[in-house]
C-alpha cells in the first residue's frame, strides 16, 4: 500500500506507539494498528459499554435488571391494591405466564393488574372491581378485560361469583359523601342496600353488565330512603363511572319496584309510579322482606308456614289502624315519609291462617275506608288543633320513616350465593332486561318481515279491480302516514332485500344484516 499523500512506499514504524508512517512525508498509515474490541481474550467488551450490561457503572446484566424492575413494579401495584400478602403468588403467576422472563413496556402493568384481579376472584374472599384495577395500573377497561381472559384461559383458573354485596359495602364504607352520617344510620344503609342489591341480582339487573353502575344506583336509592341528601351525580363521579349508565340502572330498579307493588296486590298499586316509588319504599321493602322469610312446609303440598308471623291482611289492617303515624308535624322534625309499618309497636303482626292471595276487593275496601277518614273524617281533624301541625293530602303516602318498618332479619340482608338467592321470593319473578329487549327486537323484525312480504306481493301481483277512488284514497292515506313519520326506514329496506333473495326468516330475525347481505346479496362469501 502506498502513501496517500506522496505516493511513496517507504514506511517506517514508530518504536513508542507502534504506528507506521511514511518515510518521505511522515503521514501516518491508516488502520495499521487497529484492534477490534468486540471479543478476544479480555471478554465481550464494546467501545462505550460492556456487551450484555444495561449501561455505564452497572453490575447487572440486562435480564437481571429487567426482572429486578419488574418485581419492584409488581410490589408497588399490589401495595396500591391492598394485596401485599399476595405479592409472591402474583409473581409466581407472571413468571409462569412469561416463562420466567417477566417483561417491560406498557403491556406489563396491565398483566400485573389482570393477575391481581384473577387472584382475588379465584379465592372469593375479597372485593376488587375492574374499574379499580384499571385506575391503579393506568389503562382502559377494554385493555384490561381481554388480558384477564387470556390469564384465566392460560392458567386454567376457575373464577368464583363476583361479590356485588361486598362491593356495595366497600363503596359505602369508603364513600366520602357519607363520612358525616352516624354509625347506626350507615349500618342501616348497608343492610337495606344489601337487601335491595340481592333483589336486583334476582331480577337479573346485573347480568352481562358492569357492576359498579348498579352499585351506585342502589346506593343512591337507599340513601334517599334514609333521608341522606346525596345526589347520584356525586356518587357516580366518586366511583368514576358513567352517570348516564347509573341513571339507567336507577330507572330499571324503580320499574322493578313498581312491578312489585302490582304483584303483591297493594290496593294503591295504581298510584305507584317510577317517579314516586321512593315514597312507597317503606311498604314495598317491608312486604318484600316478609315475603322472603316465608318457607314452604315439607310434605303438606302447598301449605305455607311463615317464620316471621307475616300475614298480608294483618299487615294492611295494622298499617291502616295506626292513625297517628300519618300526621306530619314540623316541630317533631320527622322524616318526610310516612310510616306504613310499625313492626316494633305494641301490637305485633300475628300469624294467621288466611289465604296468601287476599282478594283485591277486600284490600281496596279497606284502603278506601281509610282514605275517606283521611279526607273528611277522624284523621283530618288532627290538623285543626295546631297551626304548625297540619295534614297534607298530597303526602298521605309520600312519607316513609325507616325506623319502624325495617327489620333486617331476612337472609337477603347478607350475601347469598346466586343459587340460594334465586330460590327466595321477593314478590316478583323477572327476566333479564337484555333478554326482554331481544324478544321485543325479534318480534319487531318479524312484523317487518310480514310487512315486507305484503309490499312485495302488492308489487308482484297488483289488483286489477282497484277503482280510481280506492287508488286516490290509498295515496291520500300514504301521504298522511309520511306526515306522521311512519314511512319505511332503512331496516325495512334491508329486510325487504333479504326477503327478495329468499333468506331464511329465522336468520333475518336475529338481526345480523351485514353478514346476511354479504352472504346472499353481494356474494362476498364465495371463494
Curated annotation (Swiss-Prot):
Tissue: Expressed in shoot apical meristems, root tips, primordia of lateral roots, inflorescences, developing pollen grains and embryos.
Main location: nucleus
TFIIB-type zinc-finger residues: 1-30
Cross-referenced Gene3D superfamilies: 1.10.472.170, Cyclin-like
Molecular function terms from GO: double-stranded DNA binding; protein homodimerization activity; RNA polymerase binding; TFIIB-class transcription factor binding; zinc ion binding
A GO term from the CC aspect: nucleus
InterPro entries, sorted: BRF2-like_C, Cyclin-like_sf, PTF2, Znf_TFIIB
Localization: Nucleus
Superkingdom field: Eukaryota
Phenotypic consequence of gene deletion: Embryonic lethality and aborted seed when homozygous.
GO biological process: embryo development ending in seed dormancy; pollen germination
Keyword presence, Transcription: yes
UniProt keyword annotations, A-Z: Metal-binding, Nucleus, Transcription, Transcription regulation, Zinc, Zinc-finger
Function comment: Plant-specific TFIIB-related protein that plays important roles in pollen germination and embryogenesis, possibly by regulating gene expression through interaction with TBP2 and the subunits of RNA polymerases. Binds double-stranded DNA in vitro.
Complex formation: Can form homodimer. Interacts with TBP2.
Protein name: Plant-specific TFIIB-related protein PTF2
Gene symbol of the encoding locus: PTF2
Amino acid at each position: 500500500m502506498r502513501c496517500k499523500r506522496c505516493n511513496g512506499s517507504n514506511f517506517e514504524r514508530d518504536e513508542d506507539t507502534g504506528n507506521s508512517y511514511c518515510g518521505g512525508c511522515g503521514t501516518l498509515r491508516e488502520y495499521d494498528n487497529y484492534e477490534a474490541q468486540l471479543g478476544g481474550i479480555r471478554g465481550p467488551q464494546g467501545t462505550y459499554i460492556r456487551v450484555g450490561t444495561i449501561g455505564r457503572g452497572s453490575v447487572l446484566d440486562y435480564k437481571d435488571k429487567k426482572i429486578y424492575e419488574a418485581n419492584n413494579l409488581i410490589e408497588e401495584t399490589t401495595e396500591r391494591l391492598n394485596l401485599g400478602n399476595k405479592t409472591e403468588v402474583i409473581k409466581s403467576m407472571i413468571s409462569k405466564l412469561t416463562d420466567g422472563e417477566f417483561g417491560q413496556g406498557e403491556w406489563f402493568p396491565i398483566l400485573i393488574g389482570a393477575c391481581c384481579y384473577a387472584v382475588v376472584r379465584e379465592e372469593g374472599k375479597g372485593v376488587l372491581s375492574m374499574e379499580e384495577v384499571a385506575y391503579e395500573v393506568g389503562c382502559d377497561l377494554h385493555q384490561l378485560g381481554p388480558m384477564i381472559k387470556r390469564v384465566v384461559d392460560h392458567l386454567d383458573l376457575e373464577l368464583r361469583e363476583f361479590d356485588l354485596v361486598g362491593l356495595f359495602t366497600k363503596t359505602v364504607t369508603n364513600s366520602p359523601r357519607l363520612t358525616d352520617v352516624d354509625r347506626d344510620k350507615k349500618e342501616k344503609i348497608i343492610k337495606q342496600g344489601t337487601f335491595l342489591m340481592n333483589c336486583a341480582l334476582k331480577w337479573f339487573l346485573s347480568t352481562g353488565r358492569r357492576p359498579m353502575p348498579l352499585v351506585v344506583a342502589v346506593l343512591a336509592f337507599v340513601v334517599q330512603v334514609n333521608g341522606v341528601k346525596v345526589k347520584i351525580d356525586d356518587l357516580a363521579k366518586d366511583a368514576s363511572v358513567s352517570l348516564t349508565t347509573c341513571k339507567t340502572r336507577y330507572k330499571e330498579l324503580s320499574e322493578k319496584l313498581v312491578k312489585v307493588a302490582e304483584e303483591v296486590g297493594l290496593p294503591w298499586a295504581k298510584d305507584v309510579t317510577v317517579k314516586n316509588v321512593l315514597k312507597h319504599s317503606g311498604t314495598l321493602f317491608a312486604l318484600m322482606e316478609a315475603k322472603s322469610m316465608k318457607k314452604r312446609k315439607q310434605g303438606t303440598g302447598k301449605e305455607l308456614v311463615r317464620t316471621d308471623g307475616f300475614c298480608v291482611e294483618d299487615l294492611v289492617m295494622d298499617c291502616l289502624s295506626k292513625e297517628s303515624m300519618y300526621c306530619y308535624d314540623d316541630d317533631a322534625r320527622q322524616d318526610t315519609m310516612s310510616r306504613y309499618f310499625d313492626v316494633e309497636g305494641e301490637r305485633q303482626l300475628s300469624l294467621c291462617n288466611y289465604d296468601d292471595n287476599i282478594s283485591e276487593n277486600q284490600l281496596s275496601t279497606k284502603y278506601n275506608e281509610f282514605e275517606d277518614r283521611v279526607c273528611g273524617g277522624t284523621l283530618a281533624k288532627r290538623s285543626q288543633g295546631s297551626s304548625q301541625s297540619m295534614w297534607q293530602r298530597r303526602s298521605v303516602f309520600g312519607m316513609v320513616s325507616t325506623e319502624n318498618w325495617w327489620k333486617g332479619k331476612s337472609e337477603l340482608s347478607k350475601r347469598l350465593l346466586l343459587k340460594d338467592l334465586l330460590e327466595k321470593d321477593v314478590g316478583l319473578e323477572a327476566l333479564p332486561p337484555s333478554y326482554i329487549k331481544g324478544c321485543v327486537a325479534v318480534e319487531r323484525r318479524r312484523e317487518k318481515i310480514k310487512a315486507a312480504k305484503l309490499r312485495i306481493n302488492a308489487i308482484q301481483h297488483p289488483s286489477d279491480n282497484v277503482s280510481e277512488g280506492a287508488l286516490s284514497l290509498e295515496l291520500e292515506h300514504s301521504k298522511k302516514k309520511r306526515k306522521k313519520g311512519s314511512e319505511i326506514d332503512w331496516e325495512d329496506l334491508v329486510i325487504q332485500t333479504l326477503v327478495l333473495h329468499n333468506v331464511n326468516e329465522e336468520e333475518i330475525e336475529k338481526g345480523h344484516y351485514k353478514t346476511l347481505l354479504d352472504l346472499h346479496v353481494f356474494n362476498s362469501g364465495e371463494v
